[in-house]
Regions:
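Long, ordered, helix-rich scaffold segments
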Residues: 6-14, 18-261
Length: 261
């Protein structure tokens, strides 16, 4: 059973339905053989029904494209959730991925632009196609773009990350963590791109945040500079000292020795 819940009866289950007195329980019937029925099912609140709709759409292939495009356009203002579902289903069809991504990225709705980023990641498209979003006005879109850079092999990834990093305001902890996740296992290239972009002028509230979260070979020396700086208060020093615990290698040892001098 589930630990702590005292679940002992594993042979039976109970489903409770709360409804007004006299209401009738009706299960909608969908026709998954044609675009109209598929889209009606795609709009269902039931995950199982939406799954069947998605599978039917994929089976229909190119025949489903016109209806999906129309459905997405009709729901752009009326119901963005349905627009997102349609764009995702469209993007998973053969030869439709890149165009579906671009349609999503051009939306005025930041949530739909996020869908575009996630679809691009799902389709393993080059992040270079998302570069324009590095200056997006919505921080949630930029956070999603940062996440999409995680383990990216694109030659454009470090520059995109650096652009995103320069827009950290030193207040958005979630933005900072998105940068950290996005730079995983590629900190050396990403941090170097950031330092070059700011021309070495990294010692700001936001810049210190980025150094604190980073795991590059340069990080220990930068942390040592922060810790020993006259502008760093005694109350702030422990934070940067603890950050060194997450690092390893000879650079870490050299930084500790520099701090103790």
């Amino acid at each position: 059973g589930v630990g702590g819940h005292n679940q002992q009866d594993v042979d039976r289950g109970r489903i409770f339905r709360l409804a007004p007195v006299g209401s009738q329980y009706q299960v909608p019937v969908y026709d998954f053989t044609n675009p109209v029925g598929q889209l009606e099912a795609l709009a269902s609140p039931a995950l199982s029904v939406r799954y069947l709709a998605f599978q039917a759409i994929q089976k229909s292939g190119e025949a489903a494209v016109p209806a999906l495009k129309k459905f997405a356009a009709e729901n752009a203002a009326r119901n963005p959730r349905l627009q997102a579902r349609a764009l995702w289903a469209l993007g998973k069809l053969p030869n439709q991925g890149a165009s579906a991504v671009q349609e999503a990225l051009q939306s005025d709705n930041p949530d739909i632009r996020i869908v575009g980023i996630r679809l691009a990641r799902e389709l393993r498209l080059d992040v270079a196609s998302l570069a324009s979003l590095a200056k997006d006005a919505a921080p949630e879109v930029r956070r999603e773009l940062a996440l999409s850079l995680r383990h990216s092999r694109s030659v454009d990834a470090p520059a995109i990350w650096a652009e995103l990093a320069t827009q950290h305001d030193g207040k958005d902890r979630w933005y900072l963590e998105a940068l950290g996740i996005g730079a995983d296992k590629q900190w050396d290239a990403y941090l170097a791109a950031y330092l070059a972009k700011v021309n070495g002028q990294w010692d700001t509230v936001a810049g210190r945040d980025i150094v604190w979260r980073s795991r590059a070979k340069q990080t220990p020396a930068l942390l040592a500079q922060i810790i020993t700086a006259d502008t760093t208060t005694a109350a702030e020093q422990p934070r940067y000292l603890r950050a060194i615990d997450f690092l390893s290698g000879p650079e870490k040892e050299a930084a500790l020795q520099a701090i103790l001098k």
